[in-house]
């Protein structure tokens, strides 16, 4: 019983490091080499539209509602201490430090990450990647690299938009509905938010999350079994693994950025 458990655990650990190694080689092969800006730039722009622009609606709506909920819940708590003028600070710091990057990454993993995995998996199942190799075209450079950079560029921008619309949603509830003084709301927020400590750290988080989510999505599609069942399982793995990595990475980055303060 114990031997079987140890054997199974060891196999899982070995499989994990094998997959990590394959993912590293895939990313290395996609990014290292002579850049071909003229060939790859149109592909990059197309993928930025697919991953970024087509994700705008869910990002903006989610940011608006989360900002409104923050404004309402924050007002209910702060009014008991006659500190409702600090509502802008609460909403802004919550979105900049945590909710903006994290929720955007989770939504990006569910919408764009799963689509990436399914697309790459389908290309593998229909032997499109093999056909590129037969034509002396590197599929890593042609297929993986533009999608990777599109994800890394798009997700931080989506995070900025999420935060902006969330702050506006918080002001709608706090200022326009609950009657918090507009000048106090915005001035306290401006005085409490630090460019280097809050805004920059939140953006760095978004970049780390973008790399992790896009990398996981592309690898699961590139490494999946070329069958309908394999693609389905890979898509599920992308959402689960990316979400867990984002939450774990968020704790590590938060401890590094804000834990010493």
From Swiss-Prot:
Protein name listed in UniProt: Intermembrane phospholipid transport system permease protein MlaE
Disulphide linkage map: none
Species per Swiss-Prot/TrEMBL record: Haemophilus influenzae (strain ATCC 51907 / DSM 11121 / KW20 / Rd)
GO molecular function, one term: phospholipid transporter activity
One GO CC term, this protein: plasma membrane
One Pfam family matching this protein: MlaE
Keywords: Cell inner membrane, Cell membrane, Membrane, Transmembrane, Transmembrane helix, Transport
Family per record: Belongs to the MlaE permease family.
Gene designation per UniProt: mlaE
